[in-house]
């Protein structure tokens, strides 16, 4: 049987519904109850609208406790904050003013027992979408998907089970157990942690924060049915306990396109290609150095073959060898007078045609000639002396 208790309350259809609140209304459903002023319930079973202007549409065991809170479908959800809302999902609690939860939560049978997965949107205008065991504590923070996401920072975002610290304002954690503990930090990938402001992290160091455990104290209250129950005390700050990583871990960026602009990332393939080119250039440079050194040795081996006072044209060949490289040089020397000499030398072959040239002139008075006859003169003198000796002996 339906019961109308509140002034101006209305019930339309349904069964076992109770309209306690003044000007409250129930339309259809079963075992629903309106307790707040101007509250309303449409369909569903076992729903309660305890907050002023609170409303529930369908679902089961949902509670619109906050002023202006709205719940649509789902099971066992609660809108505690003013103007908070929960749509779908199970066991979710929108606590902060204007907080919103869309789906997620739930109850899971692990094989031996049932485990309740509850999302809590405690920050003002915080949002949780399609996740489980999430806690959005920071005002304006958002948690999307995954499991166990925690956002302590203002206007921070967790995607796929990441976390943000209390100082991580406007930060983003993308990936399971990824996190940011600093302002404007971005963590990309599993267990990546941003620890320097404005940076992007792809891994973590030993000792970095690996997550946060958020626990609310309990308090005893009397519910709308007059029963005393223990519930989380959302009026007090929760106890936040950080955990840390024991070992460092660094993720790889895979399947990247080659960088084009000056500030693009470089792939391993590009590095290998650049290193190969550098090694090739080094090899060519070494070959060039070897050839140049051998050529200099060959040019240094060119010498004129003029006797003292001789004039004319002379040719010379020089050889040089250095680190497996051999060079040949050809030289020409021209002495038009006893005091002037021109010389020209060039390296031939192997495409490394080095050359040199020179001009020399003798200046100042000539030094006195030292008695240093040539071999022919000495032979002639000895022959003459021998003949003179024979004549004297006759």
Model-predicted regions and their roles:
Residues 1-245, 252, 269-273, 325-333, ...:
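Glycine- and small/polar-enriched repetitive beta-structure motifs of secreted/surface proteins
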Residues 159, 172, 312-321, 339-349:
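Transmembrane beta-strand segments that form the barrel wall of outer-membrane beta-barrel proteins
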Residues 266-294, 379, 383-393:
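Extended alpha-helical stalk/coiled-coil segments
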Residues 291, 298-303, 321-323:
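Outer-membrane beta-barrel transmembrane domain signature
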Residues 309-315, 326-328, 338-340, 353-355:
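Outer-envelope beta-barrel architecture signal
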Residues 317-319, 330-334, 344-346, 357-361:
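Residues on the lipid-exposed face of transmembrane beta-strands in outer-membrane beta-barrel proteins
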Residues 322, 349-351, 362-364:
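Structural signature of outer-membrane beta-barrel domains
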Residues 338-344, 364-370:
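Repeated loop/turn-to-beta-strand initiation elements of outer-membrane beta-barrel proteins
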């Amino acid at each position: 049987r339906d019961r109308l208790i509140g002034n101006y309350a209305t019930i339309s259809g349904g069964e076992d519904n109770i309209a306690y609140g003044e000007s409250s209304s129930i339309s259809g459903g079963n075992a629903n109850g309106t307790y707040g002023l101007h509250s309303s319930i449409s369909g569903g079973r076992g729903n309660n609208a305890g907050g002023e202007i609170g409303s529930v549409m369908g679902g089961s065991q949902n509670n619109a406790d906050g002023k202006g809170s709205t719940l649509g479908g789902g099971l066992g959800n609660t809108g505690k904050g003013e103007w908070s809302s929960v749509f779908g999902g199970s066991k979710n609690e929108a606590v902060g003013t204007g907080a919103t939860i869309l789906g997620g939560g739930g109850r899971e049978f692990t094989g031996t027992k049932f485990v309740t997965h509850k999302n809590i949107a405690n920050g003002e205008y915080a949002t949780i979408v399609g996740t489980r065991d999430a806690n959005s504590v920071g005002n304006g923070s958002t948690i999307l998907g995954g499991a166990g996401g925690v956002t302590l920072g203002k206007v921070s975002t967790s995607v796929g089970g990441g976390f943000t610290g209390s100082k991580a304002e406007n930060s983003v954690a993308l990936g399971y157990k990824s996190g940011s503990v600093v302002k404007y930090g971005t963590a990309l990938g599993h267990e990546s942690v941003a620890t320097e402001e404005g940076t992007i992290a792809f891994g973590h160091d030993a000792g970095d924060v690996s997550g946060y455990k958020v626990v609310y104290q309990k308090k005893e209250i009397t519910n709308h049915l007059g029963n005393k129950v223990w519930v989380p005390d959302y009026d007090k700050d929760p106890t936040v306990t950080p955990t840390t990583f024991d070992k460092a871990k660094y993720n790889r960026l895979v399947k990247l396109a080659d960088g084009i602009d000056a500030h693009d990332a470089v792939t391993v393939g590009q590095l290998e290609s650049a290193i190969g080119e550098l090694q090739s250039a080094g090899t060519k440079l070494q070959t060039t150095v070897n050839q140049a050194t051998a050529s200099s040795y060959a040019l240094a081996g060119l010498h004129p073959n003029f006797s003292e006072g001789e004039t004319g044209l002379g040719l010379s060949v020089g050889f040089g060898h250095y680190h497996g490289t051999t060079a040949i040089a050809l030289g020409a020397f021209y002495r038009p007078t006893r005091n002037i000499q021109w010389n020209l030398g060039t390296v031939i072959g192997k495409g490394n045609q080095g050359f040199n040239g020179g001009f020399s002139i003798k200046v100042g008075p000539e030094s006195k000639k030292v008695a240093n006859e040539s071999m022919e003169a000495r032979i002639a003198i000895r022959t003459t002396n021998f003949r003179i000796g024979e004549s004297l002996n006759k």
